[in-house]
């Protein structure tokens, strides 16, 4: 989602004051998570915050339970990024981990280039907030700005065009 966008990570990185004023993240690689699908889901929370009134990115595991829509070749593309402990704490807050909107889950990500395997933390929307009856004020689609940020990062990191057009773009 938006965490693969350098501008988004830089925005949060600037909030961290360190004596050496170092960068708090490094993109190590681009990879994919097999047997998962990228989706936008409305985050069903009662809020006046307009940024939470549109759908947000998450990933879902392909299982035999969702066989009718399941794709054996499903994969989610993303960046493999090393972040400082300070930036990680800010990301946890940003992702609503402490409010149970998302949960951090360790997954094995495969490099697109070297096929090296990385253990990485992904953020997955919790069922508590994803599988609720729709609240009429929440859009089932991402905001133009949010989607654009994700699509621009995907283009920058050269994700497959078919993947971008199929999963990341909802606003044609």
Explain the meaning of each model-derived region.
Residues 2-172:
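A glycine-rich, hydrophobic/aromatic-adjacent loop/helix-cap motif
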């Amino acid at each position: 989602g938006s965490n693969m966008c350098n501008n988004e990570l830089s925005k949060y990185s600037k909030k961290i004051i360190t004596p050496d004023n170092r960068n708090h993240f490094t993109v190590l690689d681009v990879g994919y998570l097999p047997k998962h699908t990228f989706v936008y889901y409305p985050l069903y929370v009662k809020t006046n915050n307009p940024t939470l009134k549109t759908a947000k990115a998450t990933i879902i595991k392909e299982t035999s339970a969702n066989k009718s829509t399941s794709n054996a070749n499903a994969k989610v593309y993303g960046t493999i990024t090393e972040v400082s402990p300070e930036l990680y704490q800010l990301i946890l807050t940003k992702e609503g981990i402490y409010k149970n909107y998302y949960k951090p889950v360790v997954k094995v990500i495969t490099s697109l280039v070297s096929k090296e395997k990385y253990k990485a933390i992904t953020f997955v929307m919790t069922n508590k907030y994803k599988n609720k009856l729709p609240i009429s004020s929440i859009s089932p689609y991402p905001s133009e700005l949010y989607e654009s940020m994700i699509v621009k990062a995907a283009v920058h990191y050269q994700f497959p065009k078919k993947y971008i057009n199929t999963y990341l773009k909802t606003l044609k």
